Structures are given as structure tokens and as C-alpha cells.
């Protein structure tokens, strides 16, 4: 049957925010209308071409590749042209032309090509002069018929019979205005006309949703008057509709069929294409064998020396290692992967020569001796029992895949090296596409339809969040009752609003969900090709970047034949690098190359659960696991890293019990003891599954890898086939069928969540390295951690608390000592002359300062000290800190706040920055009244402006202000401790010198209010009801399928902790207490298990309520008459006289030497104590 019509103007969502159709949808529509072919012609790119081609071929539809580009025809004048690939040459030219629009230097107005580009790359290309948006149409709309004919002739001369006029009928006035002239020109020049229809949505009823999509693209609402719109006729018309529409131009319809017959190319998969590593006449096979052999010899020399191996044993090991090396080399070379290994080895060797820290390995690649020999990995695979077949299976050919971790700060240097070696046109990043997912699409649509923000925000919160498997809107409506109710037009349960508008938002969102919204780049993927990328794939380049980006997603880049290399930036490696730099400045050199993993101090620290900052071991649950495990070898760290995941986690107690000989290991069979001995009978690693199959059932390691994969996928048919092979092999090994089936079942259960040992071992090594640095050089290590988290105040708080727990002193921010980043000072810290004078003055005048004034200790003369970074203060950058440091180095310490203002550029200081510097205490050394400085900020900023204006105009005052002046600072009392504590919290996101709850700790212990430090030490596993106190630092409202819940982040003097409120009643009853900065006592359930602890709030009290409603039994110990007098005076003023009381008191009088008591006085009166009283009494409570 002769086809009736073929659409040539179909756009998908790869025309970002312009089409409401996915690739799958356009193919389905073509099949629905019985079209034998379809042309995908997205605007400006070929990003979807391979995906379209593969899907169309799969569905037995002929794909035709097209692209709509802008072409420049005059100065600042651009028109559209539709280019279609006739054959493979034409497709490659489309790749070049579409890529040129992104890589040309003159793309400021729009991405475009020029006539010279079309001339250069016209071979195999069919061109359609777009109708009203094309050159001819634009000239006719401007009433320039002669110019229209001129350009038509020019394009015809370039393309010959491959040039067509497109004609459309969307019932638009501009189309009708030019139609007669357009057809006349085509006739005069013998240019065939082809009928098209813009296809931007599936059916006419989708026009409204598509209109919303266009509003999203422009960032406007539906009511906005001057915005882009399209005709309601831009839908996927049927052949019958098109034939009827162009009944007067039957040739225009027939030409779509004729054009289809001229096109015979479909984009297809390509085999992997790597560049040639060797530019000389030397084979890659020769090179890899040469470099690997030399590398292994060097590795063994280091190994023998570090492990003190005898000469006799060295020869045995050499035989073992070289046998394995040659086995691997044979497989690698037979698979033609030598070049891949050489390329990876080359850029890693270069990185190490430049001092760029590279991870010891990642993924299964660490199981290769060849990789170890070529310095790709730093893990001895034989020593750690790693398998090459887990990485490269000779029985299942697939590309090897090395994921490489680099120091995050220097990753770009490695990428630039690769670009320079292989050519910038052959190396690129990989594009990624952001989609309009459930929450995002609701926000977008709600904004366009002017739904009030509060309602829009509530709607998005109703969609459950899942980072791993994002919940679709359809699924959310199905599973969340309130959303389902709203989707039916019945409104929301908890908020009033226009129910019909809410329904319209959800209906429209359902239509637009899943469309591409924007593009970005893959975080780590880099491709290296053997030819220019544009010969294989479309390329894209960001206007502000220099590096090419492959226009296919990662999946389709690999199908197109490109090889991906993952250049990952691992922050932990940056921590290690920076820590080693700090130690090098002190003359301490750390070399991990010959590390033996036996440092006692490291394991002692880990046994105490001190995992803060230690790679992989930072979570609360992991720290508890360390305390229970008490690791004493690198193998324990590797195993714990592999076990601490959902599923395997349930085996942690068994592993620990067997390690400490509280339980006998179950090895399943005596033959398996050597395989499972290392992990106490627990099958942890995928490599163990492979070895079990090899030893018990006679599998080759390659076949065992296929078994492991089958067990992981749990495909029933495959599992049945593998079980039959396993049992048959075990029977041949004198094992009964029933035992063989039992072992297979047990191993299959473990294999389902078994971990890659090569990866676990490599990351276990990084864990050990960080633990070693922390155990032996805690100050330097924690400073390295802090400096990567300058803007993460929760992490800063955590690391500083860890420093205090390690006996490291913290110097608060100080404008005369602090730098942009955190720094370490040892006991020989230089104390400036101004500091000495302040300390002397404070010693003399301390008694004159009000009791409620907080003066921080400024310096520590003990061992290592961490100096707080200026860049960690909110609104202050590390660059500003450098500016301050450079000024101090050049002209000495600042003498006053006005001296500071005078010496720094006025543009570098603003009110907010100055406020946070003051609140953080940066000027305490220069002026001890922070409140006064804070209140004086407007005058200080005004002074800065006038002073620098005078400097610029050279009109200097006769009297220069050089110290604090009453004309600049307002008069003020001193702030109390809590005010200063919250100043610091506002400026730094943490309580540094004083926590608001510190003064209550003695009282809390009497009221059975726990400190967070006690949660792990004192509570058994299971669910416990406890009372905690904290300051609310963060409040976050979220929504799950079960309803709304609130997460609170609190702190006490020891820790930051998180608790959740699930009950709406609790939220309603205590909402008045749940503001940020509130001091609360919370009654909560604590669930403690291997996964950590989870806190769920049940009720709250304010600190005042606790003080007013609890009875205190005070035991007071004055040491002299003055102290006794102070106690009596205070208590006398708080006598309850029979009314409300909260305390009884007993006073113990002591001898002068404080060794025994003279008298015990139990006071008969009761007292009503207030919060501030404990500031005085706390010093006498034991």
C-alpha cells in the first residue's frame, strides 16, 4: 500500500521547552498513523538522533535524521533552515553543522551557521527552506521579493535538486500573506515544494499544556501579554488531515514520500574506538608487556623491602606474581584492550609526577596485577586476594572500566593534560539532561498559572522524596490520599485554595512531567576518541567554557563507540594532600607508598569509635560498629566498609561475635574454610562467591563471575540453570546433592548483596590513611578537613568538637591572628604586643567587669592549637581573609577597629560583613565590648566612606583618628553571655566560646536529662525513652507518603543531633517552642541499632518550664566566708514563703584545706530559683 504522507517537521523534548513530545511518543504516533518513516528535526541539535534511530528501528519505523538550524543571511539577520541527512556522509555533515553552531566564536546573538559552512558541508544533505521563518519567507514578509528570489537561487546553486521549499498551513496570517508569492518563486525556479506541519504536541487538546510549557521556557505567567505562542494546529496530524489540508497541492504531499525514498541512513551503534597510544611504529601489545613487566619488578622490590621478605621466599613470590601478570596480559591483549590500559596508566603516572594525589583504586580494577604494575592502582591484588576476572572476564567480553579518584582541587589539571596529549577536539565531557520531574514540574506549572506560592510549596511537599528512585507524579497521586483528592478537584485537606486551579496545575503537570528541561555535564565522565569527536557524535560547547561536550547522554555516547573514563574528584584525597602539606611545613614527610597498615595508635583510636573525619567511618552507626568491632587489621576495615550497607548490615553482629570468639564461624563446608576464614564464615565479597563456585563446583573464575551476576540479578530461569551446573559440579567433588543445593541457596542469599572486594579494599586503604593522619597528627588533619567545609557550619561544628575532644585548643576568630582558612599553631605561637597588653589589662580589671560579661580566652600556650578561619564566618570569604592577612604582613597588626577600616579598601567592607566579624568576636582583642561595636556599625561604615573619600581627594584631616573615639562609638553596656553566644551562632552557625546550655549541665544531671554523649554509652540497643536538652539550630518541614513531618537540628555543649516530629498533635501543641534559637527540653524515643540512632520527639518543655516545675535538691560547697555570704544572700532573696518553690538546699562547710567538712546545714526554707541564679550557684555544686 502506497504511504499517504510523512511528517518531516517533528520535534521532541530535546528541543528544550519547545516540544511536549518524547522520542518514544513521536515514534508511537507515527506507527499509530501507519507512517513508514518519520523525520526527527529538533531545533539546533542532534542530541536525540541516536536514541530516535535505535528506537525507531526497533519498532520497524524508518528513521530520517534532520535538524533545524539558524543560518545567517545578512548582518544580524538569521533565518531557519531544515537540513536532512540523505546518507551517511550527509549525517556526518549534519553532525558538523549542528556542532558548529555551538563552537563558532560569533554565537553571541544566536547559535548559527553561515553560507560558507553550508557550502563546505552540503554533500549528502537535503535542505528545506523553512516557511515563514526561512530566508525566503522572511524576505517576502518584509516585501523584498527580489531579495527572496536571490537567496532562493543561492541556496539552489549550493544544493541543486536537494533543495526544497517547505510550505505550512497552521491558519496563521503570515503564512497566508506569503503563500502565493512563495509558490510562484518555487515554480519559476523549479524548486519542489514539500508540505509540512510543525509537530510540537500529540493532539489538539494538548495545546493548553504546551502553552504552559512555552511560558516555563520564557519564565512568564499565562497572563503575560507579550509572550511566545504557537498555533493549536501544531499537533501530530494524520495523513488524511494533511492530504485534505493540501488538497490543492498534491505534489507537496507526494514530495514527502519522494524525499523519504532519497534517505537511506540510520544512526547505528559503533564498536569501541580508542586513540592509538603509540605514535611510533611500536605495537601497543609490545608496550603494555614492557611497561607492565618493568612496573611489576619495581613493585616487588618495594614490597620485599617493606615486608622484610627473605630471599628464598622472594623467588617463590616472583613466580606467583609473574604467572598472574602474564595470564592477565594474554587476556588483555587478546581482547585488544592494551591501548586502554596504556592510556589510563599514562595520565595517572603524569598526575603522580605532578604531585597530584590519586586514589589507590576504585571498583573492580584494583583486582588486576597489570593495573598495579602500571601504577593505575596502588593495591597489591594477590596480597588482598582480589580477582582479575571480576574486572575483566575472559568468558564475557566487555570494555574494562577504571574509575579514577583524584584530589578534587587538581582534577582539572589531569583533564587538561589529556586534552593536550590527544587533542582538544578528541577529548570531551558528556552531556546530561535534566528532566521535569514531579516536584519541579509542579513548581513550574504553579508559577505559570499563578497558584499562590504557599499552595504550590505545599503541593510539592506532598510528593514523597526519593533520591534513588524519584517518585513520579502519577505514582504520588496514586499513593498520597491528599494529592489524589486534589487531583479530583476536591482541594487540599489542610489549606484553602482554588480547588479547580489546583486540579489544573496537577493535570498540566502530569502531561509535562518527564520532558527535558535543560542540559548540563556529567560530573566525572570524560571521553577520549581516536578521531575528532564531531566525526562520531554531535558536540556542544558552553559559551563560557573551552572544553567540548558530547551531545549524547552517557548511554548513547558508549553505544556510538566512545570510551568513557571517569575522572572523579574525591574530597578525601584533597584532605590527605592538604594535611601532608601542613606536615611538610613542619619538616614531617608522610609516604603512604610502603605503608604496612599496622600502626597501633590508629587502631586504638578507631576502637574508641573516633570516626569523625575518617573516610567511610563518620556516621554515628559506623562509629558504634567500630567500638563493638575493635578493629586491629586492615582486613577489619575493609570488611566493615563492605558490611555497613542495607542488607549486609545484619551480618555485622555475627562478624563481631566470631572475631571475638563469642561464636563459632560457619564455613558451610570444610573446603570453604580458606575462603571464608578471613571474614569469619560470613560471605561478604563477590570474589568469595566466585572462589566458592571454583573450589566447590569446578567453575572457572570467568564462569563463576557469570554465576555471581546471575545471583545478583535473581532472574529465575538463569538461577535454575546455574543451580543445576553448581550441583552437578559439587557432586563431582563428592558433595551430596542436598548439601550442594543448601550451599547454593545460602551463597545466593549473600551474593544478592555481596560487595566488590577490590573496591572495598581500595577504599579501606583510604580509610586507614585518614585514620592514621588523624591518630598521629590530629590538629593538622582536622584543619585539612575544616578548610574543605568553610561554608558548612554543621561540619565545622563537628570538627571543632572533635578537636576539643582530642585536647586541641581553639583560638576564636581574631582579626590579628586568623587567616582566610583554618590554620595550626604549635606551642611557639607568637603573641603580639597588643595581645599581651590586653591580657595584662584583663587580669587587672576582670573584677570590674560585670559578672554577666563574657570575655573569651584568646590564646593557648599548650600544644597544637587551631586558629578559626575568617573565611568560615558567614558573609566573609577566604579571599577577604587573604586580604586581611596580606595587610597585616605588610604593615603590622591592627591597633583598633578604625585602624582596620582605614587600612582596608572600602569596597571590601560592608555592613553585613562588619556585623558578622564583630559578632564572631574578631575585634575582642582590640575592644572588649562587642555590643558597643555592633551598635556602632552605621557610624563605622560612615567613617569608612568619609575617610577613604578624603584619602582619594588628598584632603587629609588635621586630626587623624587612630584609636577608638567617642565620636565614632555609641555608648553601651556589656552584653550577657547568652547574647554573645547567640551573636556567635548568627555569625558562624555554631556556639564557639560558650554554649547557652553549659550553665545548666549540673542541674540537668540532677533531673535525669541526658547529655547526647551518653546516648551510645549508656543506652542499650532497642527503643528507649529519654529526655534531652538542646538549642534548635535548624528546622525543616518535609512530606512523605504518610504525611508531613518536621526535622529539627539541635545542639548541646557536646554534640549536634537531629530529631524528627511525626505527630501532628506534637507539632500543634508545641509549635510555640520550635523556633530556631529556642532552648528546649525534649522527651523522645531513641531507637538504637547497627544503623545508628534515630530520635523521635514526643513532647517539649522550655528551659523556663523545667526550672519552674522541677524540684532541685542542691548541695552547695562554699570554700570561704565570702562564698558562703554570696550563697546566703542569693537564697534569702529567693525564699518562697510557702508559695511556688523549686529547690531545697544543703550547705557543706569545709575546713581551710578543703579535706573534710566542718558542718552540714540543711536549710528548712524552700526557694524559687530562676535561670540566672545557676550562673552563681553552679560554681558551688558538685
Swiss-Prot record:
Catalytic activity: DNA(n) + a 2'-deoxyribonucleoside 5'-triphosphate = DNA(n+1) + diphosphate
Chain's role: DNA polymerase III is a complex, multichain enzyme responsible for most of the replicative synthesis in bacteria. This DNA polymerase also exhibits 3' to 5' exonuclease activity. The alpha chain is the DNA polymerase.
GO biological process: DNA replication
Enzyme Commission (EC) number: 2.7.7.7
A Pfam family that the UniProt record links to this protein: DNA_pol3_finger
Protein's UniProt name: DNA polymerase III subunit alpha
Organism in which the protein naturally occurs: Rickettsia prowazekii (strain Madrid E)
Sample GO molecular function, one term: DNA-directed DNA polymerase activity
Similarity comment: Belongs to the DNA polymerase type-C family. DnaE subfamily.
Gene: dnaE
UniProt subunit comment: DNA polymerase III contains a core (composed of alpha, epsilon and theta chains) that associates with a tau subunit. This core dimerizes to form the PolIII' complex. PolIII' associates with the gamma complex (composed of gamma, delta, delta', psi and chi chains) and with the beta chain to form the complete DNA polymerase III complex.
Cell location: Cytoplasm
Keywords: Cytoplasm, DNA replication, DNA-directed DNA polymerase, Nucleotidyltransferase, Transferase
Signal peptide residue numbers: none
Gene Ontology CC terms: cytoplasm
Domain of life (superkingdom): Bacteria
